[in-house]
Structures are given as structure tokens and as C-alpha cells.
Amino acid sequence: MASLMRKAAVAPAKATRTTVKASASLQRVAQAAGVAVAGFSLALSANAANVKLGADSGALVFEPATVTIKAGDSVTWTNNAGFPHNIVFDEDAVPAGVNADALSHDDYLNAPGESYTAKFDTAGEYGYFCEPHQGAGMVGKVIVQ
């Protein structure tokens, strides 16, 4: 009977050690998850906004027409239809000292899925348009805070 009591006394000690190990493992998993979430947040901020060239309905618009980002972030425009589109920044509608031509993508994005990305370092408002569809109202704005 004494040997049974010793075994019973030893068993809880093993369970306690297992609990400590499980707790340490859970702590490592939580830390790894925190690092993964932080990395994902940084990846999202590096490409802060996405704009469709042409609406799902087929309308000749930038969707959304206005995006707001932080200085240092980027905007990606993706052709959503088979129409040729481009992104032209108006030199009179960008902050002083910003080269509108350097931001613009004059070449046409012809196929669905083709994209262009620009990075914005200077705060202010940036007006742009699609050259072949400006008359149809295909204009947009990037607001950089």
C-alpha cells in the first residue's frame, strides 16, 4: 500500500511539469502569432490602397474614386476590364515640388489584371485621370496624410 501511495504522490508532480511545459508552449505560440500579425500589418501598410480601373458594372470610373493613405504608402491600380486605361497625374493637381510625370503611368494597361503601383512620399492631394476616358468622368484623387 505504501508503494501505491508513492506512485500517487509522484503522478501529480508529473502532471504539474506537463502543465508548465504546455503553458510555455502556448506562450511561444502566442509570441509567434504576435510576430506574424505585426508582419502582416506592415505588409498591408506598404501597399495601403487598391483602385480598380473600371467598375465591376462596366462603368468607366476609378473604384474607389478617392483613397486616403499615409506618406510613404503606395497605391496600386489594377485594370478590372478589357478597356485600355492609364493613370495620369495633373501637374496642377499635385503638391508643389512633386513631379506629376514621374507618378503617372502613360502607357495603357490593356488586359484585366494588369497593374501599376506608385509610392507617395509627400502629404497633400493628388488629382489624376484616365486619358482616354477623362471625358466620361474617369477621374480620381489620392489624399496623402
Curated annotation (Swiss-Prot):
Stored InterPro entries: BlueCu_1, BlueCu_1_BS, Copper_blue_Plastocyanin, Cupredoxin, Plastocyanin
Domain Plastocyanin-like: 49-145
Co-factor(s): Cu(2+)
A Pfam family per the record: Copper-bind
A cellular-component GO term for this protein: chloroplast thylakoid membrane
Targeting signal (transit peptide) range: 1-48
UniProt GO MF annotations: copper ion binding; electron transporter, transferring electrons from cytochrome b6/f complex of photosystem II activity
UniProt: Cu cation binding residues: 85, 130, 133, 138
Predominant cellular place of this UniProt entry's protein: plastid
Record's function text: Participates in electron transfer between P700 and the cytochrome b6-f complex in photosystem I.
Family annotation (PANTHER family): PLASTOCYANIN MAJOR ISOFORM, CHLOROPLASTIC-RELATED
Name of the protein in its database record: Plastocyanin, chloroplastic
Source organism (scientific name): Tetradesmus obliquus (Green alga)
Taxonomic path: Eukaryota, Viridiplantae, Chlorophyta, core chlorophytes, Chlorophyceae
